[in-house]
């Protein structure tokens, strides 16, 4: 398999979402291009669509360019974060898949994985000069770190975990890598709780990743800006993977006068898809339409 092999989640729901468009001759913005899986399906299904794909991860952009080579004359890939982008003209559809892709999780050097040992980094753009996860946990005081782990990870043991992390740093210096941090977090759980389907470090790693990449603030900017990108009748679809994201998307689609909800309740993966692709278990798809006069 190629180094950035990635199975798009809720693919049928995304393609079905494009059926709500008033026509299919215009621009699709994939705000989180990744490996290009969703975009490839949409370009194949709707020959009149043209793609502007945004991603700050150079590995993802290279993989997407390869995957979308058959549609090269209809594709533009930009090295940017969706929060800092504005399209030159109204577009038909905006798509965002908010999850960390499997290839990013499966490459130890990226520092996202608690199962594979790697540097404690977690930056979506590893070439940036932004703060790494290692620098973040070193900088924060114990109470602030606990608040972060609770607020962004919804981790009920956040105080105990923050205390353990700061004690480790004081006693032995920086963690050698992600495995050492994951081991420390797991040690804060009772032995029986360490054997569940969900790894004990999942919520803590989620919290650190969100903080390092300012993910919720970036999502808020997308939800504020993207409706203005759409032509009347155009649609915006978002795939979220945890409740912090989904609540924001749900609230924006419900309260934004520029939008009309198409999905009243989120679409989730079928049992079959969840069995084939465990990553899809927590995925939720919401879709809204741009309305006129706002």
Curated annotation (Swiss-Prot):
Pfam families for the chain: Methyltransf_5
Main subcellular localisation: cytoplasm
Location of region: Disordered: 265-285
GO cellular component terms listed in the entry, alphabetical order: cytoplasm
Protein location: Cytoplasm
Gene Ontology MF, one: rRNA (cytosine-N4-)-methyltransferase activity
Gene coding for it: rsmH
SUPFAM superfamilies: Putative methyltransferase TM0872, insert domain (SSF81799), S-adenosyl-L-methionine-dependent methyltransferases (SSF53335)
Similarity annotation: Belongs to the methyltransferase superfamily. RsmH family.
Catalyzed reactions: cytidine(1402) in 16S rRNA + S-adenosyl-L-methionine = N(4)-methylcytidine(1402) in 16S rRNA + S-adenosyl-L-homocysteine + H(+)
Function recorded in the entry: Specifically methylates the N4 position of cytidine in position 1402 (C1402) of 16S rRNA.
Enzyme class, broadest EC rank: transferase
EC number per UniProt: 2.1.1.199
Protein name (database record): Ribosomal RNA small subunit methyltransferase H
Superkingdom to which the source organism belongs: Bacteria
Keyword Transferase: yes
